[in-house]
Amino acid sequence: LLESDLLYEQGYSVRINTPVDPLFYYFDYDQRSHDINMEFQHFHDFYEIHILMDSRATHIIDGNVCALQQYDIVLLRPYRMHKTQYPEGPPFKRLIINFAMPKDIPGLENAYKSMFLSFWEEIPIYRLPKELRKAVFDPLNAIFTLSHS
């Protein structure tokens, strides 16, 4: 485990269902390096949360180049073009959370829309102060811990 605000184990993952299912999530604790940077922007038909756990990287969203710092949170809605670029040097740790939720749950239509507003920002990158970051990371750490039980 890496000493940090967010629990981490290299190569660990948690998966419930698959991307074609209406309810799906996948936590991918891994690392990437400059040597395996993606050549092109890409998209998927599910949501993605990217949390950089190391010092720096660059995220390109719809052609906009954005510098990332440790613990920045990138929120990507489905079909949004993006890619991450990592600088030369040792691999960089990150957590990727991919997920999909059913959109047709009766009574939750308005809640669903408001829950995902942050994913629709022009630059959906969030740099939270430590107190707020803890509120976001605590549930992620609980999932990590419970999945090891």
Regions found by a protein language model. Name each.
Residues 56-58, 74, 78-84, 104:
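Histidine-centered metal-chelating micro-motifs
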Residues 1-30, 81-148:
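A hydrophobic/aromatic-rich effector-binding and dimerization subdomain
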Residues 1-69, 73, 88:
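Generic protein-terminus/edge-of-domain signal
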